[in-house]
């Protein structure tokens, strides 16, 4: 068994890589179907406020936030609302802001790995970090 310190480091790695993976998944949900092979904007259609939209909601005033939340509530019935919110997220920098947060989580995961001696296992986990940051599906 690993020491408590090593266990805590691996927990931090797992949480960080998991958050990065989820944020990348949220970003990919805004991309076109041809790129991912699955329908886009499912999160909007399911009224899920993921990080790309959340960063936009946090950056606008109260009146604008209420308007965007009302649009989100209509996403299951109106493609126009889905397209509108996608446009807002893209043009207000929501995906870029989310990508920066994802990179911060990946940096945390990589910093954990620096606490370990070089090995094929550490290299495999580092490669996983690269994959999560670059995946497009």
Where are these regions (language model features)?
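All-alpha prenyltransferase/terpene-synthase fold signal
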Residues: 1-137
């Amino acid at each position: 068994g690993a020491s408590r310190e090593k266990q805590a480091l691996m927990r931090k790695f797992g949480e960080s890589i998991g958050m990065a993976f989820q944020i990348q998944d949220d970003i990919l949900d805004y991309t076109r179907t041809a790129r991912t092979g699955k329908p886009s904007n499912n999160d909007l259609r399911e009224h899920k406020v993921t990080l790309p939209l959340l960063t936009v909601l946090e950056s606008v005033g109260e009146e604008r936030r209420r308007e965007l939340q009302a649009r989100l509530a209509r996403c299951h019935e109106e493609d126009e609302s889905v397209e509108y919110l996608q446009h807002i997220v893209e043009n207000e920098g929501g995906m870029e802001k989310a990508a920066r947060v994802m990179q911060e989580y990946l940096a945390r995961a990589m910093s954990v790995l620096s606490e370990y001696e070089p090995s094929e296992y550490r290299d495999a986990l580092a490669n996983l970090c690269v994959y999560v940051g670059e995946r497009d599906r």
